């Protein structure tokens, strides 16, 4: 019974968390008595989101066995593809500065430059793939993001070249620890706190999943608030949705194409297609136009629905 309950929770946690987040947004937006608490609660929640990202990455890195991971050729090709796509989007955004739906392009950039999700290996294993090889890519993907995000985002913020270095340092100061500190702590836990490491792999093996669920509520509420106050037109909303779907298709499509040359279609598809959207949404909300975070939120929906479809088809 417990196993069935767990499966039910895993199946429906995405829509439930997003519905709860949406209802929380409505509650504090429409109930007049609660309006006075909206800003204090927002200020309280803001530091919780990056903390959740750190906990999720720490839990994922605790499961990674460095000694069993080997660099693969397709890792390099995917990283190069990610970098090229990021630079192309930066070029388009900077060239078409007055583009009406610029927020959609910036949202697409945040999705492209984002790291691989910790759950990519789990999904790949359910599709007949190999979890360890994706864990290796997840490490290098996160390491690259710690550098590329601070380098690229200041270029599209539109605040002039004189502010580039200051923005680079600011974003680096915030993003680098979120990615690197969990990895360092996970390695220290393995080396010096073996009982805690064993505990993380057994009793707390699903910690990242539940933290992800909780953070999804907070992220959804904040994204809904941003969309509501942005007064989006139908065309603008469609532009954001189109950007999210297009990036998701490109991610999974290119991943599978690159993987097909190395007989790693499933692994490469998941490694490149499934991104850490909680992290991407946090980056979009913090360092770009908040409307851009809607693209990452929609991307998260699309990638999860696509993976659910793949798993159902694979099990037939």
Residue ranges and their predicted role:
Residues 1-316:
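Alpha-helical transmembrane segments of multi-pass small-molecule/ion transporters
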